[in-house]
Amino acid sequence: MKTSIATVSISGDLREKLAAIAAAGFDGVEIFENDFLAYDGSPAEVGRMVRDHGLEITLFQPFRDFEGMPEQQRSRAFERAERKFDLMQELGTDLMLVCSNVSPLALGGIDRAADDFRELGERAGRRALRVGYEALAWGRHTSDHRDAWEIVRRANHPNIGLILDSFHTLARRMDVETIRAIPGDRIFIVQLADAPLIDMDLLYWSRHFRNMPGEGDLPVVDFMRAVAATGYDGPLSLEIFNDQFRGGSPRSIAVDGHRSLVYLMDQVARAEPDIAIDVPALPERVAVSGIEFVEFAANETEAEELVLLLRAMGFSLIGRHKNKDVVLLRQGAINIVVNTEKEGLAHSSYLVHGASAYAFGLKVDDAAATVARARALGAELFEQRHGPDELAIPAIRGVGGGVIYFIDGKSELAKVWEIEFEPANDAGNDAGLMAIDHLAQSMNYEEMLTWLLFYTSIFKTRKLPMVDVIDPAGVVRSQVVESDDGGLRLTLNGAENRRTLAGHFIAESFGSGVQHLAFSCRDIFQTADRLTELGFNVLEISPNYYADLEARLGLEPEFTHRLRARNILFDRDEGGDYFQLYSQTYGEGFFFEIVERHGYRGYGAANAPFRIAAQKRTLRPKGMPRV
C-alpha cells in the first residue's frame, strides 16, 4: 500500500511539511503548486529535498482551465502545459493533475475535451509523463467522475488517465458503484478526503471543511471499496483543505492522516478481501467490555482529600501497593487508584498538571493484540520500569500525554490487584454505585478530530452527532464515542476559550485530560440519601430548573419534589429515563457524576447548561490565589 498526502493538507512551509510527512510514515507527497511557488529553492532542489526525506513525488497539481477552450485560449493552455512539463521533469515526477474546467469561456462537449486530452497525451508521452483528469464537483461542464472517465476513454491515450477524488464524488451523492466498471489501470491516482455533512456551496465546503477519512460523515469506505474492486493498486493520497489544519501542528496532522489511511484500508480489506492493494494485516478493532480502573496522580495532601471524597461516595480502601505509594479503592466494579509516588510518570504528570486522573485501564479480550493494532495506527507505546511482584501492563499514550492501560482475562493481567496489592481492611459504606458509566475528557477544540480518529480507529466504537453544550462563557463542542453495548463510553469536550468550565480546566491543569467520571447506580434516590448520610457534598441545582422541568416534561409534582430535594437532574428520550447527580468540583474543575439509566442512550446534554452554571458558582473566584 503506497500512501501519499498533498502538501496543501498540512501547515508550515514546504520544508516543515516534508519533514512532518516523512516522520508520519508516508511513502509519497503531492506537490501543490502554491507550496512550490512560495519556496525559494529551485525545482531540482525541491526534488532532492523530497527524496532526501525518503519520499517520492506522486503528483504535481493543479493544472486548471485546460479542456474545451476557444482556439486562442486553447493554444495558450497547451503552452502552459509544456511549461508545467518542464517543471515536472526538474522536480522528478511523472504525473500532473488536470482538474475539470471552471472557466466561463469553456465550451462543452465530451469529444472536444477528449480531443484536447489526446493531444496533451501525445505531448506528455514524448517526455515520458502522464496526465490525470479529475472531475471537480463544481466543474463547468464536467462535474461527474463518469463524464471524466468517458472523456479519458475517448481520448484513448496511454498517457491520459483518470483521477478519482472521494470528496467530488460523495459531495454530489453520486453512486459509487459506478466506479467498479472503470479499469483499474486507467486510474492514475486516488485522492481521499472526508467532510462533515453541511448544506453549503460545494466549492466553499471543499475548500474549508474537508477532513481525514473517518473524521467526517461521508461514506469514504464505500467509495474506496468500489475503487479497490477495479483492481487499482496505485497510491492512496490525502487531499485535505481545512482551515483548522492550516493552523495546526504539521506533525500531528500528518500522523492523523497516515492513521486515517491505514484505518480506511483495514476496513476496505475486510470487506473486499481480494483487492490488489497490499494492505498491512492488523488485529481487528478492539472490543472494550468496560473501564477496569482510573488512576489519579496527587501529592499526599491532595490524595488524602481525594480519598476522603471517595469514602464519602461509599468507596472502600481495599489495597495498598506492595512496592509503591499507591492505594486502591473499590465500590461495585469501580476501581480507583491513587498514586503519590515521587518518581515515574504519575509524579511527572502531577508536576505538570497537578492532581489529575492521568491514566485509565480498559478491559479487552487480548491486551497484546490491542497494543499491536494501536501501534500500527501510529499510537505511542508506553513502558516504564517495574519491580518485583509488578506486571508489565501493555499501554499507550492518550489525551494530554496520559496513559491507557489494557487488561485482559487470558493472562496474569486479570490478577493485577491480587499480584500487586496487599489487602487493606478499611471497609467503607456502600452507596450503591456499580460501574463506570462513562469518562469525559476535555481538550482544546482543535484536538477533537485527532482523538476522535484515535478512539474510533483502535476500538470497536461509533461516534454520535456532535452536540453544542452551552456554557455561560461560550460554547463547548461535545462528541460522544461509544461501543454498541456501552462497554466503553467516552465524551470528548472541545473548548474554544478559557472562560468555559472545560476551558478553565484545561488552562488550570496545563493541558487536556479527564475532567469527570460518571458512575452508574442501582437506585439514584437511595444512593442520594446514602451519600447525604456519608457527608457527601452534592452540587446544588437552581430551584428554577425544577419548575421548568416539571412543566416541560409533564412530571408529577411529587416526583419533581423528590428530584429537587436531592439535587437530581432528570432527562427523558424515546428509550427511557435518565437521572444525574453531581459532586462539587475538586481541584480546578474535576468532578464526579452519578447516573441511573432506564433505556436512555444519551448523556443528559439538555441538563448540561444548568449543571455548568451551578459548578461555575463553586469555582475559585478569578484572581484569587490557590491556597
Positions of predicted regions on the chain:
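N-terminal pre-domain/capping segments
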Residues: M1-T93, A254-R285
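Hydrophobic faces of well-ordered beta-strands that scaffold small-molecule active sites
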Residues: T3-T7, V29-I31, I57-P62, M96-V98, ...
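Alpha-helix-loop-beta-strand connector modules within alpha/beta enzyme cores
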Residues: V46-F63, A114-R127, V152-H157, L218-F223
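A structural motif
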Residues: F26, M88-T93, I187, Y232-D233, ...
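Glyoxalase I/VOC metalloenzyme domain signal
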Residues: L14, A23, R270, I275-G319, ...
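Acidic/histidine-rich catalytic cores of soluble enzymes
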Residues: G28-V29, E119-D217
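Acidic-and-aromatic substrate-binding clefts and catalytic sites of carbohydrate-active enzymes
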Residues: V8-R15, F32-P43, D65-S75, S103-G108, ...
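Active-site acidic/histidine proton-transfer and metal-coordination neighborhood
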Residues: E67-L162, A171, S252, D256, ...
